[in-house]
Design a protein with these regions (language model features):
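Short, well-structured N-terminal submotif of metal-dependent ribonuclease cores
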Residues: 1-45
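Acidic active-site catalytic centers that drive phospho-/nucleotidyl reactions
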Residues: 6, 110, 129
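A generic structural signal for short hydrophobic patches within well-formed alpha-helices
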Residues: 10, 50, 132-133
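A short acidic (Asp/Glu
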Residues: 14-16, 52-57, 135-139
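PIN-domain endoribonuclease scaffold, especially VapC-family toxins
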Residues: 34-39, 47-97
Length: 163
């Protein structure tokens, strides 16, 4: 598996997302374990995704599976079999943030993941961030796939999840 992992997946894997259930946590642990064992995580060359991971996870790799994944990514930064880094370009445009994206209203903190997905064509793994479902028209327009690991938590209200 080759994928971009939204930070919320790692937080849920650690059991720290209060509204995620045990099934969601298991799905997140399973996904990041599969990537760690025989997959590739895709990051940006500027370090934005890694910086966000660092804000929520521990370099020691403990105490949870999300922390272990972060340590795995950090330790394998220069192993092209485990970590792929793609180039994205920052632009001075509040409506885009990255050259790879059209004007959009996606949460600014999520735009780096989308820009990496546009360049790499890898899917984004999401657990609990409903912004991805809210932005499904944008995501479709740039031909990106968001894999919802926990569809029961990835929408606002009772609206059906669009995949």
């Amino acid at each position: 598996m080759r994928a971009i992992v939204d930070t919320n997946v790692l937080v849920v894997a650690n059991g720290l997302e209060t509204h995620a259930d045990a099934e969601c946590q298991r799905e997140c642990v399973s996904a990041i374990t599969a990537i760690s064992v025989n997959g590739t995580v895709v990051l940006d060359n500027l370090g934005f995704i890694l910086d966000e991971y660092q804000e929520h996870l521990n370099f020691s790799g403990q105490p949870g599976p999300g922390d272990a994944f972060f340590k795995h990514v950090y330790d394998n930064m220069y192993s092209s079999k485990r970590v792929e880094r793609v180039s994205i370009t920052v632009v001075d445009d509040e409506k885009r943030a990255f050259e790879e994206l059209p004007a959009n209203t996606l949460d600014r903190s999520d735009r780096k993941f989308l820009a990496v997905a546009v360049v790499s064509k890898a899917p984004i793994l999401n657990a609990t961030d409903s912004d991805w479902d809210d932005a499904r028209a944008l995501i479709s327009s740039v031909e990106v796939v968001v894999k919802q690991l926990c569809p029961q938590h990835a929408t606002r209200g009772n609206r059906p999840l669009q995949t």
